Amino acid sequence: MATVTRLCVTKSVPTVNGQFPGPKLVVREGDTLVIRVTNNINNNVTFHWHGIRQVRSGWADGPAYITQCPIRSGGSYVYRFTVTGQRGTLWWHAHFSWLRATLYGPLVILPPRGVAYPFPKPHREVPLLLGEWFNADPEAVIKQALQTGGGPNVSDAYTFNGLPGPTYNCSSSNDTFKLRVRPGKTYLLRLINAALNDELFFGVANHTLMVVQADASYVKPFAATALVISPGQTMDVLLTAAANNPPSRSFAIAVAPYTNTVGTFDNTTAVAVLEYYGAATSAAALRSLPLPSLPAYNDTGAVANFSASFRSLASAQYPARVPRTVDRHFFFAVGLGADPCQSPVNGTCQGPNNTRFAASMNNVSFVMPRTSLLQAHYQRRYNGVLAANFPAAPRTPFNYTGTPPNNTFVTHGTRVVPLSFNTTVEVVLQDTSILGAESHPLHLHGYDFYVVGTGFGNYDASNDTAKYNLVDPVQRNTISVPTAGWVAIRFVADNPGVWIMHCHLDVHLSWGLSMAWLVNDGPLPNQKLPPPPSDIPMCS
């Protein structure tokens, strides 16, 4: 724990090595990481290395009760894994309850020595973590929401590398992140959306950004003045400073929310400063810097246009290995729902019409087990732990983006999809209008996937499949299901283990918006899950 003050609120927060945000890990493609975690806080905790493929090292993936039991207070665990075939910006964070509000940091993977970037070498590289600050304890926030059945209280500020900037009350220039640049130099900004519950627009006043990478996968470079980045996603962008010192030497860097939710959200703008060397921006000047032009908070069209710009390099050195044929097709309806008010607080529940908020895929709200699914799978002890019958499509189809059905109640279960090794998979993720259509950033553990198609309205297999991009689709580990729309992804199930796929809005994850893939061993020794480490935490 460390004492941190933001917005005139001083509190003790969980940290890694006393740092908020946590320490930067810099490795090279091919390195093996050995990270010993000792839990000195009162909560259980686990850590996830977000975007690392964990090839045959699922025991190190980190989601609580999926690949391991939590590290108890006073306990420790060694995460050991090798970075295989990946380079770029990823990140690490706690994967238990809402602890990742302060337990997060960058994970930078450099190319092997002697291998250049497929874009101009930058003068400097700068990790930029976009987060949320809660004056209250985030653990108390989600606990209260789950008790009452309503939505959680929203954050009090957005942050750049843990700093909220000058636009908030009781936030000084000392709480403002400053990026100092030299004229004519190019900087690689390694953007990470570490916010708990908000997709964010990002921009730099009077500067154009060149997007070169997404989720540690190179993309065909494209220019943009406003970006959108979802929780869990990373984005590498090049910023070139003006060749000569401009008349004004300080420029606002801003983030603001993108949302279509019908509920409350943190509708504030956080500011950092791009400062040319030699400038000295006063506190008063910081507050009056012109902001970059960002889309309106609900501008889904701007988000769609930006998202459509991403294409893989698809070069000889970095090919796009898109599955052309598919062994198994899945259609997941993704959205909110409700539970009956069986445990009222003060006689009522605070969800819609005296219900409790829930979330689901194919109307199954995921129930977190009390033991590790990977351990149960390795020991083949499934009874009472999981059911291998997650539905491949909704049991009762409906007009997903039209008038919602009258019955909004969800079912519950720890249900998984079993896959044979090397199965090629296509998943269509369809947003629903139940309790309001909204974007859902879905993250798949253990894999990258290709985003082969997207659109608005209800997915139509007879027409939409023909529009797929099977040449140079972007490769990601986290993708937002468009508001009132759909997205199609493909991957090859060549990594044995149990891999959760979940919404990276933590409130939706808390309400059950997740499922898991159980990928069986292949026939060869290098296609099998190794035994668990001797120090893996036990649940009982």
Curated annotation (Swiss-Prot):
Gene3D superfamilies: Cupredoxins - blue copper proteins. InterPro entries: Cu-oxidase-like_N (IPR011707), Cu-oxidase_2nd (IPR001117), Cu-oxidase_C (IPR011706), Cu-oxidase_fam (IPR045087), Cu_oxidase_CS (IPR033138), Cu_oxidase_Cu_BS (IPR002355), Cupredoxin (IPR008972), CuRO_1_LCC (IPR034288). The keyword Transport does not apply. One of its GO terms (biological process) is lignin catabolic process. Cu cation 1 binds at residues 48, 443. It is an enzyme of class 1 (oxidoreductase). Disulfide bonds: none annotated. Its EC number is 1.10.3.2. GO terms for cellular component: apoplast. Keywords: Apoplast, Copper, Lignin degradation, Metal-binding, Oxidoreductase, Repeat, Secreted. It is found in: Secreted, Extracellular space, Apoplast. PANTHER family: LACCASE-11-RELATED, MULTI-COPPER OXIDASE. Lignin degradation and detoxification of lignin-derived products. This is Putative laccase-11. It comes from Oryza sativa subsp. japonica.
